[in-house]
């Protein structure tokens, strides 16, 4: 944008310098032409005669001596020396015929130059207004962009804050779930090492008890058999005893 404004200012400066140079050249050419025409006219003017000078002097004296409003000057056309005027001279006729043509040819060019100058000035003003409008529009757009940037930054910061709050809430929720799980489950009592080995000892104890019980039962059965045998021997004593020993002593079951 600054480059466009700089280019427009440079073009304006060049345009004004060119216009000044053109106007200066046009004025100088017009001055030269007017000086040449004036010199040509002065050269072609013929000097006045002595008779005409004397008549002019008489008229001046009469005007001075007379009162205002009383003197009326009568001029005869035949008294005027027509040869003294440049319009009646051949050279002056040529110059008079050429002079208006040059002036007429210069005036349209000058008018066209002025029209072109006005058009260029109008176009330059339009370009300046357009550049000013574009600059203001660009400034407004930049301000809007900056405002949008600030809005985006604020929205991102708000999103970050919301994400942090969400993470904190998730952490608290997980802690609450863990606490609820701990409360819902009962803790198991710890057993000592003796309690861990008790089932084996109990099994061994049962086995020992069974073995001793079996042995006890066998002994009881043997004792009952012996008692019954002794009772039977007491009721029926033996007649032939080879030795002096009692029958109970010779019984192998007593051993």
From Swiss-Prot:
Glycans are attached at residues 88, 95, 136. Residues 87-110, 245-255 have a biased composition (Polar residues). InterPro entries: Male_ac_gland_sc. GO terms for molecular function: identical protein binding. Residues 183-192 have a biased composition (Basic residues). Changing residue 25 to L: In strain: 35. This is Accessory gland-specific peptide 26Aa.
């Amino acid at each position: 944008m600054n480059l466009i404004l700089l280019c427009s200012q440079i073009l304006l400066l060049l345009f004004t310098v060119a216009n000044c140079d053109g106007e200066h050249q046009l004025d100088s050419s017009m001055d030269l032409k007017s000086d040449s025409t004036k010199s040509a006219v002065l050269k072609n003017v013929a000097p006045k005669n002595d008779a005409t000078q004397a008549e002019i002097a008489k008229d001046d004296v009469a005007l001075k001596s007379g009162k205002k409003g009383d003197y009326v000057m009568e001029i005869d056309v035949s008294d005027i020396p027509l040869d003294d005027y440049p319009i009646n001279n051949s050279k002056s006729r040529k110059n008079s015929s050429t002079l208006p043509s040059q002036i007429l040819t210069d005036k349209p060019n000058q008018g066209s130059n002025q029209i072109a100058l006005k058009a260029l000035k109008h176009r330059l003003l339009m370009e300046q207004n357009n550049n000013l409008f574009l600059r203001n529009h660009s400034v407004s757009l930049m301000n809007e962009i900056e405002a949008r940037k600030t809005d985006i930054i604020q929205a991102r910061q708000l999103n970050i804050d919301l994400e942090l709050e969400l993470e904190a809430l998730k952490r608290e929720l997980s802690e609450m779930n863990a606490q609820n799980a701990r409360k819902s489950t009962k803790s198991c009592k710890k057993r000592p090492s003796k309690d861990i080995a008790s089932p084996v000892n109990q099994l061994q104890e049962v086995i020992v008890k069974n073995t001793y019980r079996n042995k006890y039962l066998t002994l009881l059965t043997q004792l009952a058999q012996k008692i019954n045998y002794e009772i039977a021997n007491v009721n029926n004593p033996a007649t032939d005893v080879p030795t002096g020993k009692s029958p109970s002593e010779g019984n192998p079951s007593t051993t």
